[in-house]
Amino acid sequence: MNNKKNHAMKRSPFYLVPLAALLTAACMTPQYNKPVAPIPANFPIAQTDSGPAAVDIGWRAFFKNPELQEVIATALANNRDLKTITLQVEEARALYDIQSADRLPSVNATASESRSRALLTTSTPINRTVYQVGVSVTAFELDLFNRVKNLSAAALAQFMATEEARRSAQILLVGEVSKSWLTERTLYEQVQLAIRTLEGRQASFDLVKKRFDAGITNALELRQSDTLVQSARVSLLALKRQHALSVNALQVLVGTQIQSSASMQSLAKQETLATIGAGLPSELLTQRPDIRAAEQRLRAMQANIAAARAAFFPRIALTAGVGTASTDLSGLFNSGQNTWSFVPSVSLPIFDAGRNKANLKVAEVRSEIAVASYEKTIQVAFREVADALAARATLNDEADAQQAVQKSQSERLVLAQARYQNGIANYLEVLDAERELFTAEQQLLQTKLLNLTNAIDLYRALGGGIQEMSK
């Protein structure tokens, strides 16, 4: 008897169905292939610094100024853009939880009372009341082809991408706040410089006017001196306007009102951690959250391809229930009142006017877009680091050279004033020296700002700004 049964199973193909389903499901699970990073093995500018990696340096260690640290902390707590993306992370997590719930059956408790009236030809109508209680599982999909699993994987990847995007937004915010704060400090110092310059030129004008009134000098020198005064006044007004705009921009980033004060530390005393190890370009793939976010989005798109492929195969759903029923409420839980139901169903796509094919095509195209976006993100990151390294190679020397220019122009003005007072040179030489000194001092402040902001750009480009304290 058993031999006949075994022989029948060997001839029957139905016992192969579960095995075929498992093999097909394995094919439905995508094999993630990480694209090759389209960047060189090394940065164009050779680096000799052996400092710690930017990701290991907390922003409180990098930005040593206590006032700047307070501004950054306030921005992280109040910035509206960061709040928005933080809420988006919570939304993505909730969507992942919703999608993951589809992988488990939903069990519901039910209770009902139904009343009916039956019309009979042989007797009077009968009124009937039925009470039912029980638990049920409604349309639970047996995920034989990993459709639900891949949709859950896609939702998880989207959640991870959103979390990485939040980290990237924080890095960007820390960098932008610090640069905006330094810009405000620079403009404040330029305003103070313009005020001192205006006062000095006004004093020179008063002296020239006295000489003019005494008949020592001519009207041309008086007008030249007055022109220099008015030029300084125009520069002062323009710088005051720029400073006010910089304060407004900083307040938007910080999310609250801040005060610009003369007691704040001057730009010359600002310090950042200069010894940041650039490392290798390949390390950017793990250091930069925007690259990790792009990779997670790519994972999500590839999981969606597998889910779209699974739509071509049958969907098996189970609906089941167990409980008790009685026409008398008091007898609902008596022996012999048990009820149950078991309703499996299979849905196989036959004709859908090309909907499933179109969905698969959309998923494949979106995956290709995600690959291009991932590669572009890597290239942009490489360029940002390379640009910051190239600038760092010359900015320190440029700042030293500009400092020497400012010193020479200051000495030139002293000599020009002495020559004019001794009658050796005309006043035009003094005016030219004053203009050149003012320009040199403004450029010195700009060079210092550029040097500091470049250090911030390198710190951000290498993934620094997530940790508050150093590891």
Regions found by a protein language model. Give the residues of each.
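Periplasmic alpha-helical coiled-coil/stalk elements that build and connect Gram-negative outer-membrane
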Residues: 3, 148, 157, 161-280, ...
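Terminal intrinsically disordered/low-complexity segments used for targeting and assembly
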Residues: 4-5, 10-77, 156, 240-286, ...
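Small/polar-residue-enriched beta-strand and adjacent coil segments characteristic
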Residues: 31, 57-58, 66-67, 71-74, ...
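Charged, alpha-helical scaffolding/interaction elements associated with membrane systems
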Residues: 78-79, 214, 422
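Sec/Tat-exported extracytoplasmic proteins
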Residues: 79, 93-96, 100-103, 173, ...
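Amphipathic alpha-helical coiled-coil segments
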Residues: 84-99, 169, 173-196, 200-205, ...
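Short coil/turn motifs that cap or connect alpha-helices
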Residues: 218, 257, 425-426, 465
